[in-house]
């Protein structure tokens, strides 16, 4: 922890550091710290820190600042469900949240990285590009995530979803760096991943004896919130930025007056990330026991009260993804997520199952990780997609499909993963919308891939069930160790939503240790309720 801050173009830029952290910044680990003596009487004036002095310039800008790539190839509707390969629900839940992170997904769909990637082996950005492209262009299907996504992390048992999330983001961050060239640590803070998820804390200590002020700046990638005494995310944020009194045994050793004196320490956000990851600290560090309590979180969150500069307008974030853990310990249970598609509809992503849900249901969960995006960023990327989804003549996809497919295959060797067979790559390159997809189903009812079934007796009269294709995506060639994990459909028992699904794909066993005996259909059912 502790990369220097950057001063570019008259504006401070603080980005993520090389070592991930979720805790409150500690001044002892920060490199940027400036103190100043009062210009007049110690009792009558306060001197601010000038952070512009002695900062190293950026030798190389690894990604354009301020403006992230936009892509018009992103479908507005929800994409594919993900196959559980045995205790991989934590991976699936994390990947779904990243897939629906607009700045990241649009960058992946633009294929900017893979067109210039020179790594001899697969990198995480190329692997994520293939996954996101495949997932977003496979509505109504269940796909199997590449094993490369969890390479070096998955050990065949339940893992913590937050740890895997940060593992993936950190791997993407490293993939942004040129592997064969030396890059200074200032330039590392200019990567695209930093620009999406990175921000910076300011820890300001004020000596109550000489009134000197010391500012320490500490980059962050996610924000951990203590919820022991908080009933809402706003209360947890207020506690986080509440001034801390340093006196008695915790008195401050002032570097200005050279005395051990009482002081106050105030933590604020100096710069806020485009995408904000809030982690609710539900698990103990030692035993892993879970704090199961309801913590309220809003659909729209104003972060301005927690910023260093208070003279600007509201800084509004909108919720777009929620990670949920069901269980009593981080060592067992089940992970699933809720995501907001480009169309504005919320969906529950539970491994292979993708179900329409309401915002009321989303806000009533015992959330573990919350994903917010700046409202301006959401609107900017949404407008780009809306402009790119112009009507196309039927069959237009067929005329340019070969060109797009060849372009995708030439991008990078990682995009030619075994599970990305010709049929799936062909699907991944099509630009589709939910309305267009429904229209195609009406025109091709004789095709076995999709069936729009009649309303079942157990569903509301205005519900629509879209059944899973008979094609088993990603399951054509099973690994030997996976063969023993296939379940017998006749022994499958499910409750609630699972009882309404009538697909034909078998799922893999062992989403978690605790739920190892509970089987799950590997079809992908889309339930639309008004």
UniProtKB/Swiss-Prot annotation:
<keyword id="KW-0833">Ubl conjugation pathway</keyword>
<dbReference type="GO" id="GO:0004843">
    <property type="term" value="F:cysteine-type deubiquitinase activity"/>
</dbReference>
<protein>
    <recommendedName>
        <fullName>Ubiquitin carboxyl-terminal hydrolase 17-like protein 3</fullName>
        <ecNumber>3.4.19.12</ecNumber>
    </recommendedName>
</protein>
<keyword id="KW-0645">Protease</keyword>
<dbReference type="InterPro" id="IPR028889">
    <property type="entry name" value="USP_dom"/>
</dbReference>
<feature type="compositionally biased region" description="Basic and acidic residues">
    <location>
        <begin position="382"/>
        <end position="392"/>
    </location>
</feature>
<feature type="compositionally biased region" description="Basic residues">
    <location>
        <begin position="511"/>
        <end position="524"/>
    </location>
</feature>
<keyword id="KW-0053">Apoptosis</keyword>
<dbReference type="GO" id="GO:0005634">
    <property type="term" value="C:nucleus"/>
</dbReference>
<comment type="function">
    <text>Deubiquitinating enzyme that removes conjugated ubiquitin from specific proteins to regulate different cellular processes that may include cell proliferation, progression through the cell cycle, apoptosis, cell migration, and the cellular response to viral infection.</text>
</comment>
<dbReference type="GO" id="GO:0006508">
    <property type="term" value="P:proteolysis"/>
</dbReference>
<keyword id="KW-0539">Nucleus</keyword>
<dbReference type="GO" id="GO:0042981">
    <property type="term" value="P:regulation of apoptotic process"/>
</dbReference>
<keyword id="KW-0256">Endoplasmic reticulum</keyword>
<feature type="domain" description="USP">
    <location>
        <begin position="80"/>
        <end position="375"/>
    </location>
</feature>
<keyword id="KW-0378">Hydrolase</keyword>
<feature type="region of interest" description="Disordered">
    <location>
        <begin position="382"/>
        <end position="412"/>
    </location>
</feature>
<feature type="compositionally biased region" description="Polar residues">
    <location>
        <begin position="498"/>
        <end position="510"/>
    </location>
</feature>
<feature type="region of interest" description="Disordered">
    <location>
        <begin position="491"/>
        <end position="524"/>
    </location>
</feature>
<dbReference type="InterPro" id="IPR038765">
    <property type="entry name" value="Papain-like_cys_pep_sf"/>
</dbReference>
<dbReference type="GO" id="GO:0005783">
    <property type="term" value="C:endoplasmic reticulum"/>
</dbReference>
<dbReference type="InterPro" id="IPR001394">
    <property type="entry name" value="Peptidase_C19_UCH"/>
</dbReference>
<dbReference type="GO" id="GO:0005829">
    <property type="term" value="C:cytosol"/>
</dbReference>
<feature type="compositionally biased region" description="Basic and acidic residues">
    <location>
        <begin position="398"/>
        <end position="412"/>
    </location>
</feature>
<keyword id="KW-0788">Thiol protease</keyword>
<dbReference type="GO" id="GO:0016579">
    <property type="term" value="P:protein deubiquitination"/>
</dbReference>
<dbReference type="GO" id="GO:0006915">
    <property type="term" value="P:apoptotic process"/>
</dbReference>
<dbReference type="InterPro" id="IPR050164">
    <property type="entry name" value="Peptidase_C19"/>
</dbReference>
<feature type="active site" description="Nucleophile">
    <location>
        <position position="89"/>
    </location>
</feature>
<feature type="active site" description="Proton acceptor">
    <location>
        <position position="334"/>
    </location>
</feature>
<dbReference type="GO" id="GO:0031647">
    <property type="term" value="P:regulation of protein stability"/>
</dbReference>
<dbReference type="Pfam" id="PF00443">
    <property type="entry name" value="UCH"/>
</dbReference>
<comment type="similarity">
    <text>Belongs to the peptidase C19 family. USP17 subfamily.</text>
</comment>
<dbReference type="InterPro" id="IPR018200">
    <property type="entry name" value="USP_CS"/>
</dbReference>
């Amino acid at each position: 922890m502790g990369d220097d801050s950057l001063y570019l173009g008259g504006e401070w830029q603080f980005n993520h550091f090389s070592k991930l952290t979720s805790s409150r910044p500690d001044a002892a680990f920060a490199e940027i710290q400036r103190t100043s003596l009062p210009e007049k009487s110690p009792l009558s004036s306060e001197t601010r820190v000038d952070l512009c002095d002695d900062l190293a310039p950026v030798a190389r800008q690894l990604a354009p600042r301020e403006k992230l790539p936009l892509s018009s190839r992103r479908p507005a509707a929800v994409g594919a469900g993900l196959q559980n390969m045995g205790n991989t629900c934590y991976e699936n839940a994390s990947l779904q949240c990243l897939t629906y992170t607009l700045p990241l997904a649009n960058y992946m769909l633009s294929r900017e990285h893979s067109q210039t990637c020179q790594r001899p082996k697969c990198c995480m950005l190329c692997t994520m590009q293939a996954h996101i492209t495949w997932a977003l262009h496979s509505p109504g299907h269940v796909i199997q995530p590449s094993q490369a996504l969890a390479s070096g992390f998955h050990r065949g048992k339940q893992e913590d979803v937050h740890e895997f999330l940060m593992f993936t983001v950190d791997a993407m961050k490293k993939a942004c760096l040129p592997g064969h060239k030396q890059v200074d640590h200032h330039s590392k803070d200019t990567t695209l991943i930093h620009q999406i998820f990175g921000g910076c804390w300011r820890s300001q200590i004020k000596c109550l004896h000489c009134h000197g002020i010391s500012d320490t700046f500490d980059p962050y990638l996610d924000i951990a919130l203590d919820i022991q005494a908080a009933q809402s995310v706003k209360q947890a944020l207020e506690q986080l930025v509440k001034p801390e009194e340093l006196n008695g045994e915790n008195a401050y050793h002032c570097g200005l007056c050279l005395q051990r004196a009482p002081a106050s320490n105030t933590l604020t956000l100096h710069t806020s990330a485009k995408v904000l990851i809030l982690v609710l600290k539900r698990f103990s560090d030692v035993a892993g026991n879970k704090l199961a309590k309801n913590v309220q979180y809003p659909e729209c969150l104003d972060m301005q009260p927690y910023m260093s500069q208070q003279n600007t307008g509201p800084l509004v974030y909108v919720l777009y993804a929620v990670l949920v853990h069901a269980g009593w310990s981080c060592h067992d249970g089940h992970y699933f997520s809720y995501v907001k598609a480009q169309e504005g509809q919320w969906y529950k992503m539970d491994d292979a199952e993708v179900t329409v849900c309401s915002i009321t249901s989303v806000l009533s969960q015992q959330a573990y990780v919350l994903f917010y995006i700046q409202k301006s960023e959401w609107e900017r990327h949404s407008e780009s997609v809306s402009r790119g989804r112009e009507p196309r003549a039927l069959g237009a996809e067929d005329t340019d499909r070969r060109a797009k497919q060849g372009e995708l295959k030439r991008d990078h060797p990682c995009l030619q993963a075994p599970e990305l067979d010709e049929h799936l790559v062909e699907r991944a390159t099509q630009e589709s919308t939910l309305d267009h997809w429904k229209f195609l189903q009406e025109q091709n009812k004789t095709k076995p891939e999709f069936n729009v079934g009649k309303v079942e007796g157990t569903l509301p009269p205005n519900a629509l069930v879209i059944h899973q294709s008979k094609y088993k995506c990603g399951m054509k060639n099973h690994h030997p160790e996976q063969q023993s994990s296939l379940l017998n459909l006749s022994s499958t028992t499910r409750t609630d939503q699972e009882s309404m699904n009538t697909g034909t794909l078998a799922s893999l066993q062992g989403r978690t240790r605790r739920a190892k005996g509970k089987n799950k259909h590997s079809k992908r059912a889309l339930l639309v309720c008004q």
